[in-house]
Amino acid sequence: MIEPLQPGDPGRIGPYRLVSRLGAGGMGQVFLARSPGGRPVVVKVILPEYANDDEYRIRFAREVEAARRVGGFHTAQVIDADPTADPPWMATAYIPGPSLRKAVTERGPLYGNNLRTLAAGLVEGLAAIHACGLVHRDFKPSNIVLAADGPRVIDFGVARPLDSSVMTQSGAVIGTLAYMSPEQTDGSQVGPASDVFSLGTVLAFAATGRSPFMADSIGEIIARISGPPPELPELPDDLRELVYACWEQNPDLRPTTAELLAQLSTDHTGDDWPPPHLSDLIGSMLPLGATTSPNPSLAIEPPPPSHGPPRPSEPLPDPGDDADEPSAEKPSRTLPEPEPPELEEKPIQVIHEPERPAPTPPRPREPARGAIKPKNPRPAAPQPPWSPPRVQPPRWKQLITKKPVAGILTAVATAGLVVSFLVWQWTLPETPLRPDSSTAPSESADPHELNEPRILTTDREAVAVAFSPGGSLLAGGSGDKLIHVWDVASGDELHTLEGHTDWVRAVAFSPDGALLASGSDDATVRLWDVAAAEERAVFEGHTHYVLDIAFSPDGSMVASGSRDGTARLWNVATGTEHAVLKGHTDYVYAVAFSPDGSMVASGSRDGTIRLWDVATGKERDVLQAPAENVVSLAFSPDGSMLVHGSDSTVHLWDVASGEALHTFEGHTDWVRAVAFSPDGALLASGSDDRTIRLWDVAAQEEHTTLEGHTEPVHSVAFHPEGTTLASASEDGTIRIWPIATE
């Protein structure tokens, strides 16, 4: 609501006289004001406590610059600004009109040529933004104002230059979840194609009155965004095809704004604006200059027309009352279905971290960065008595409080006017992985005689772990783009290997321990000389994140699986690609060599395990998993069995016959990691339920449950002697557990 000025509010900012409040946020205030000539303006002011922070001033200046670069034809034009003032402020033109969200929610969806005109106007706006070298990154219904002359795009608080490499922590994801692109949700590079994906989502909302990817949980929304597109019977065929094109998972396959404009201009003049059922709502917005009241109303809405859709206070008509089904070219008589308000339009700040599949959706995201925690997460497990208190690293946060905190976008909707402002603040520690001094044993300690697990901690998420063949070294991969190598006996960090430019997802030692392989979100596989702590080779060929790697038993080959849907074999001696293993239709999560080195197995989100001949690269067999996702894989030491993890179960296969042998049940969430003990008697599994479970393979029953991690477990590895087990978790720890074999 519009409120009177409060005691302590400034009477004037720059040359603008403030007349009322439009909204307050955690870091700023938005006022209604008048220019010296009496024109209505909206003034955004940063609170003094944040104005004293140089980082805030820089970010605010960037927002001003972004809005100015685009200009006023497609946006709320910046009239004036002073980012160096005390406090910093920006004045923008007042645009009479409701937000798209308000209009559709209160009056119903758009249809036919009205929808096409909206689409063309939005594409023009995005084209102008992209032509200035910017990406909006928060394109959604509440950031679109329906003015009398067409739609306007507002809020450049999260817009970012295409060539910008500063101002946001690497891997940070910004935006509103239900309108994000797949690359936004997992922290990938975001370009103009990301806005095009969001455009498709906005048009689907405008045509149906509901967010197409909305679901009951945040995890489900993520899964829907990266899954098959929903059906849209409400859209005419041409617009449905356009929206589906915008929703291509591969950003390179989405149409450009120029291509979209060319399609929308065919057989359409653009004269259908404003939509008839919205004309009174758009026309009712009175210019502020029309009143001299000290607290003028921005909008006066007349009673709804008798022929229009029902108002929200009226009962919704029963769909059964209509004899005819509503067509794609005429409005539905029902108002949009209500969406869960806490998920639909609440912007979030996402700190890039390894992603975990949601517990319930049919198609989880890869075990990758960018997982959003549920709105009501499980209570954190208490720290065991031997573990000292530690500061948790930043996680995905859904910021939905009325008083915004650092990183929240505040959108103020008052009588049809939407004014949005954004100020970001967050820091991510760059502290390297380090042994926890309170639990690390002395150099003389025997790691096999520990009563409690030893803990190596990090201020970033730990996502990969591997023992060297002799068991003296432990390697770990994390979100800091580094590989860390520790001495197992002392807990001292021996090496930090630098070279990857993104998350290190997987690590594996060669059979002789001389080399270490690593796979990363930078789409490369790298080989390292362990003794010299130097990079030996870089294998390039994948076009997306490398999710898993494995050394062949003789050390001559490295296998890799990627989000690009392929597995690849690399020749270690020559540094060349030996084979590209094609057949999966979705991400390849896991790869594993058979102990004799003749086969390599790959597991995919397509629900299959494929067995490949290493020498020829030909497919030998396909195992259809009972669950839809194969997230992790391992061969038994004798090669007779293959195990994979999926939803909340662990599945055991007979390799020779391809028959399923047993399903281990006990986990309550996705199983990201599996490993056999060196003697094959035990099977370890790590899960999003924050536990590691050991299973007796012969007895086909649970042996032990290891508890202590407070976040999902991404990787497990047995010590070569089988008496300890290492685990890596999103909680920032790598734990080395003693294993009782009796």
From Swiss-Prot:
Family matches, as Gene3D superfamilies: Phosphorylase Kinase, domain 1, Transferase(Phosphotransferase) domain 1, YVTN repeat-like/Quinoprotein amine dehydrogenase
InterPro entries: G-protein_beta_WD-40_rep, Kinase-like_dom_sf, Prot_kinase_dom, Protein_kinase_ATP_BS, Ser/Thr_kinase_AS, WD40/YVTN_repeat-like_dom_sf, WD40_repeat_CS, WD40_repeat_dom_sf
Spans annotated as Disordered: 266-394
SUPFAM superfamilies for the chain: Protein kinase-like (PK-like), WD40 repeat-like
Repeat region (WD), residues: 455-496, 497-538, 539-580, 581-621, 622-663, 664-705, 706-742
Domain Protein kinase: 16-266
Catalytic activity, as annotated: L-seryl-[protein] + ATP = O-phospho-L-seryl-[protein] + ADP + H(+); L-threonyl-[protein] + ATP = O-phospho-L-threonyl-[protein] + ADP + H(+)
Residues that coordinate or bind ATP: 22-30, 44
Active site: 138
EC number of this enzyme: 2.7.11.1
Keywords (A to Z) from UniProt: ATP-binding, Kinase, Nucleotide-binding, Repeat, Serine/threonine-protein kinase, Transferase, WD repeat
Record has Zinc as a keyword: no
Start-end of Pro residues biased regions: 301-318, 377-392
Its job: May play a regulatory role during the complex growth cycle and in secondary metabolite production.
Family membership: Belongs to the protein kinase superfamily. Ser/Thr protein kinase family.
Protein name: Probable serine/threonine-protein kinase PkwA
Organism: Thermomonospora curvata
